[in-house]
Every structure is written in C-alpha cells, then in structure tokens.
C-alpha cells in the first residue's frame, strides 16, 4: 500500500496540470508529438494514450470519468495478472539456468599410491554464473522491457524501461535489504562470506550509475553517442572478469598451478585458478608439480586443499548425529532423513531461492518437501528388476564345491543340487573325476557315472574312494566335473531338443575340488593368506587358521594381536590374545577380533595377528619316539631313524604365520555418503525431466510450508485457503508454461531459449499495460516505472531474499547478489537498447536523443542513497553488531527504518521532480 500512497501524493501534486488548469513551464521546450507521454520533459501527465508495441489504443480515446475508472481497474488487474505469469515463467527460467550452471565434466584424480579415479568438476564458476545467467534470470523483465521499448517505438528513447531499471535497483538496494535485515531471528546475524566479490560488485554498481550520469549530463547532454552506448555494453564483461579475479584472488596473489576444492554447497569439485594440470593428486600435490617448501614441510596444502573433504565431513557428521537422535531407525531410514537434512542445510544458489519463493506464493508447495516425498515414493533402481537367472529352468550344480578329507577316511561324499524349474522333468547329468596333484589309482579311485534327478528330487550324492598309504606327503587334491545334461519327461523318457526355453541347465559351480589331507603328520598351521582387508563396520572379523599336511593328535596354538598404524585397546580394534585347540582330525579353527567403527570416509590402518609355536598335547607313537632316551644312553641306529621320522611329523608353523589386517572404510557407508552428496545437487531438485511431470506439478495444489523441520519427519500439512486461491489464480499460467521443454532437455538450453521468448512477450504486454494505465489515470511513465513496474518485477526477488536470509548461514545469497544485479541491469538493459538505437540513428545520420531531466535526477538520487546504504552495511560488520543482517534489536530496527526511509525518499523526490515541484537536471 505504501507505493499506492506515494503515487496518490504524486498525483495530487500533479493534479492541476492533469485537469488542464495549468500550462507547462514556459522555460521548458515543447514535447515531441510522437511520444506516448505527451510531455516527457514537461510537468503534466496525459490522458491521451498512444499505441503500444502489442496492444492498440482502447477506443474511444476520450472516455468519461466512469469509463476511465473502469479502464484503470482493467489495466491494473491485467498488469498484476501479467506479473503473476511473469513470476511463474521466471521460475522455469531460473530452473533452466540452475541446470545449465550445474553442468559438470570429468577429471582424472591420481592418488598418492598411483591409483587413479574419476572425479567431477563444475564447469561454471559460481561468481561468473551469478553475474551472468543468474543475474539475467532475476533481471530479465527489466532488461527486456528496456530493449523492447526502444526497438518497439522506432528506436526512440522512452521513460518506462530506464525508469524501471533505476526503480528496481532502488527497490533491491533498500527494500530487499531492509526486509533481510529485519527477518533474522533475535540474537542471530548473517555476514557476507565473499567480501572481495561484494566489494567489486558494489563498486561496479555505483560506477554504473555514475557512468549513466556522465553520459546523460556531462559527456553529451541529451544525446547518447555510439561509443558511449557500446562502452556501456562492454563494461558488462569487464565487470564479470573483475569479479572472477576477485573470487580467485588474482588481484592479490599469484598462482602457478591449478587446485581443486570441494564445494560445500553441491559436494562436487570446483576448479581453482592457474593452468589446468592433466591430473591431480588427492593429497593436494600434482603430477609434475613442486610443492612450496612451507606447505611441503607442514604436510598440508592451502585452504582450498584443506576444503577437499569438507562436504563429506558434513554428511558424515549428519549421519552420526541422526544415529544418536534416532537410534531405532535402520541405515535406509537414516539415509532418507539425511537426504532431506542435507538439502535443507546446504548452501543454495539464488536461482533456488527465487524458485522456492515463487512456488510458495503460487500454491505450488515447498520444493524440498516435494522432492523428498517423490524420492520416498520412487522405487529403488533395482526394485522389481527381473532375475536374469529365473527363467523357469532347473539349475544343477555342486553344493558345496570344496571338500576336505583325511587320506584314511576311505571315501568322500559329494552333494549335487537341483533347484528351480517346474519340477515335472527328469534330468540326467554325468560326472567324472579329474586329476589334480592327486593321481587316480594311487591317491583316489577314478570314478564316473550318471546322476538321475526324478521329478521333485532336489539333491543327489556321489561317493569317491580315497586310497590310504603310510608315506608322509603334502596335501593333494583332485576334481569332480558335471557334464552332459539330458532332459526326460516325468516317466524318464528322453525328450527331443526343441527350440523353446530349456527346462534345465548346468550352472556354476560345475567343478568340485576335493583336498586329501595327509594323516601321518600333526599338521602345518598357518593363515589362509598373508593379507586380509576388512571393513570397519564389520564389528567382529573372523580369521581362519588352517591345519594342512596332516591332522594327527591334539594341538594347542597360541595367537596374539600386534599394533601397526592401527591402535588396539578400543581405539581401532580390541586386543586379542589366546589359544586355539585343534582336536584329532580337526583341520580349521576360527579366531575373532573386534573392530571399532569410526565411520570415516577414507581409512587405511593396519595391525597384525601372530601365531605362536604349536604345542602337541595328545600324541601317538611319534610323541613317544620323540621323548625316548635319556642323556646317559646313546640311541641305537633303529631308534635314531624312528625318532627322525617322528620329528618330521611334529606340528610346525607354516609360511603364513603372521597375518596383516588392513582396516578400511565401510564401502556401504562411503557409498551412502557419495549418494547423499550426489542427491543434493539442486539441479536434480528444481529441474524437470518430462512433460508429464510438468503437467502434474501444474495442476497439483501443495501446502506452502515455508518453515522447515530438521529431519522432515513432520506430517505433511494440507494446503491452506491462500494456497488454493493462489493456485486457481495462477493455474492458467502453470498449465500454459508446462508446455515448455523440460529443463533436462539439451542440458537446460532448450527451456532457456523458449523462456527468453516468452518473457519478452510478457514484458512487452506489461510495458503496454503500464503505459496505458498511466495515461488513463494521468500518471507519468517515469513515476509509473519506479513504483508499479519496478515493484511488480521485484516482489519475487524480495521473497527469495527473505527465504535465503532465513535459511543460509551467510548473507551472500540474500544481499550479495543485489549489487551485482544492479550493475548488470545498467550494462545489459541500457547497454543493449542504447547500442542498437545509437547505431541505428548513426546510420541514419542523426543523433540518438535521450531526455535527461528525470532519468539523470533519479540516477543521481539513487547513487547518493546507495553510498549511504553500503556504508551502513559495512559498518554493521563491526563485532558489536555481528554482520550485515540481523544483530541486536536496536541496530536491526534502526537499519530497517533507515533503508525503508531511503526508499520512500527516493520515490517521493523522483515523483516531485517528475511533476516539476522540484527542479532536476
């Protein structure tokens, strides 16, 4: 209502002129006949409307007072409705920009041990995207309005486009910042994190309006020359380059190589400054690159290198906190909560906050809650996937495929299984033995034959004879193979081969291995391997100790753990010390060690398990021979030979008597962290993948729940009356814009291009409606632009900044982009429009004339007030306030009142100058 009140004041001030009771100031030149406003340089508004770019004049052009009031209401309502449509199409436009700027490329990452892996690097620099596509997305209506106004009115300068740019800049600088300062909860504050970038963009914002004043009032008053217009346009890329240099610290430091850091907002690797290397090292160093002495001595990299795992640590901490908060939930449930938590707390782009604010206003619901609900309803990628092996055929195989037996056992029994299928066929499968180190005839009996599985039978056994001898020898093995499967009917009659689906097939394991253990030795004791990799989440690891080359007698085997880089005593694992007792003919024992789960993303610590000398407890004749004799009697030759043979049979340690255990990170936990990081890419949240999804969103009403709970466990709230009203007011626009290409198509560029065209069309309509509304009520275009049009184009940005101020931990997303957008509006909005017009009139041999009075005054007024506002923001960074936003109640209210007062004064002075109550330039 404040803008309406100010306009009312302005109308009262200019009322005598509008009613024809006064004449223009004699000292001012007469207005040109072709201007839509009868007197752009004069003092009165005009009731005579001119045709717009798209809308014709509403005939008759001299209506009665009642018709004027009705027309004004129609124009105003239509303009508000167009602003709603503009907000919704800007929502789609910003979503496409988020998808474009989130594009990534792959790089090769080389670990310190030489291993390589593939990582992702964001192509767009965050600062560059904020000043280019993001600024274009939030300021597209103002920029296109200026361009369309000039091009649609025979390349003549108007007041609506430039006035909207300056008025929007004032609204953003004063009202948006005032709202952001006020909404921060008591006792909290927000600071700008990237202060260097803010300084650069703020300086360019001030310079942009100083440059406008120089063009309009100093260099060539009343005329915009070609070089001035083109230089204004060139300042845009120069501003972007300076901001990029500030972000990379190239203005202060020199870098000779490129580093990468992990962006805490999206969890992906972002390239830093310098020349790109072919590959990078995960420890912060690079292939073919020397590390500076100080960094190499400390063993740490610079700040960017130390931030490499920042986002992963955040996700890991989230999971740990959620485990403590919800001890009764399993990992899958915790992951679902963590996904929402990570989305809620990560830093977000301005595009996201703009989209979130628009959808909350139009009854489309909370973006994050909708994404979390869709993810919960969406089945897993593997759910319901058909089993390739479940094709209706019976599967025949050995179960198990490994067998051990002593050479004195006589025979070994092997099992063959038949699983699956319909169970109404007879299967014939052949088997035969094959030599390994054991030979048929000397170590085992050669065997071959046929197994018959009748309908309903699921298991068959076959027996192989083992040959015993009295010769001490190493363990030996042989094989048994399944082959030549035939299928019969239920009565056992063979069926002819058909071209249909097979009823049975042989599957792995088709080969069984039988190991024959020598029974003439107490055994050789060792671990199965020298190295064992375990995950820290295992809890307890089972380590097998095998007894080979014999299993005679009872043997006690001591063992103990020894620290390596991993520490016992409950730090990384629990110490283990004890004895394993192998009974007669027992060939395997298991010892257990408890592993401590630290929930680390990357881990590689080791410890050792050592076996002690085996002790022979219950012995046979060999033990008696070993103990035979005393120190006084010399053994006979026969006794010495017997003792030598017995010595060969005593238990000993094998080659693998020391096992290295390497504790690694949990792969499930690591994959969970990676999935959480991947899922929090905001392009996946706000983008669309199909027209079906877009139309479903368009016709669905959702609750506009702006406040977020920590874990998303709150029950979903029903839409309010306001949500339903806003949905039905905007459902036409939602369904219409659902016809646009989804943001996923062509990496967002298809939606981007179509949105530009639609925004241009709506902007042209808004410009015509605003001009016709102004001429209907006698309101000058310059006042109409700084109040109604600027307000309509800036309302979504206000809500977006409010949401960003509340949810972000810093002030960059809420106010840090305001200054950048203001500079971009001038350099692009006026630079493009004036460059086209100046070149056009230069070709015609005539100058491009711009009426300087109102615009130059507004620019000067805004520049002075902007200096005051930026100075206040910088002062608020002092410790007793804490930051640009929020702070103690007194300074917060004072800052809010000051910024709102500056905006009211700007509107008031601009209106007074437009109606000649105060003199401008």
UniProtKB/Swiss-Prot annotation:
The modification Phosphoserine is found at residue 622. The cytoplasmic Calx-beta domains bind the regulatory Ca(2+). The first Calx-beta domain can bind up to four Ca(2+) ions. The second domain can bind another two Ca(2+) ions that are essential for calcium-regulated ion exchange. Detected in neocortex and hippocampus on pyramidal cells, astrocyte processes and dendrites (at protein level). Brain and skeletal muscle. SUPFAM superfamilies: CalX-like. Glycans are attached at residues 34, 817. Ca(2+) 5 binds at residues 536, 598, 600, 665. Ca(2+) 6 binds at residues 598-600. It comes from the Eukaryota. The keyword Zinc-finger does not apply. Residues 248-267 are annotated as: Putative calmodulin-binding region. Residues 21-68, 153-164, 220-222, 741-747, 792-822, 876-892 are extracellular. Pfam families: Calx-beta, Na_Ca_ex, Na_Ca_ex_C. Residues 1-20 form the signal peptide. InterPro entries: CaCA, CalX-like_sf, Calx_beta, Na_Ca_Ex, Na_Ca_Ex_C-exten, NaCa_Exmemb, NCX_ion-bd_dom_sf. Mediates the electrogenic exchange of Ca(2+) against Na(+) ions across the cell membrane, and thereby contributes to the regulation of cytoplasmic Ca(2+) levels and Ca(2+)-dependent cellular processes. Contributes to cellular Ca(2+) homeostasis in excitable cells. Contributes to the rapid decrease of cytoplasmic Ca(2+) levels back to baseline after neuronal activation, and thereby contributes to modulate synaptic plasticity, learning and memory. Plays a role in regulating urinary Ca(2+) and Na(+) excretion. Residues 91-130, 186-196, 247-720, 771-772, 844-854, 910-921 are cytoplasmic. One of its GO terms (molecular function) is calcium ion transmembrane transporter activity. Keywords: Antiport, Calcium, Calcium transport, Calmodulin-binding, Cell membrane, Cell projection, Glycoprotein, Ion transport, Membrane, Metal-binding, Phosphoprotein, Repeat, Signal, Sodium, Sodium transport, Synapse, Transmembrane, Transmembrane helix, Transport. Belongs to the Ca(2+):cation antiporter (CaCA) (TC 2.A.19) family. SLC8 subfamily. It is a multi-pass membrane protein. Ca(2+) 4 binds at residues 443, 469, 473, 476. This is Sodium/calcium exchanger 2. It is found in: Cell membrane; Basolateral cell membrane; Perikaryon; Cell projection, Dendrite. Ca(2+) 1 binds at residues 407, 443, 469, 473. Residues 23-42, 372-391 are annotated as: Disordered. One of its GO terms (biological process) is neuron cellular homeostasis.
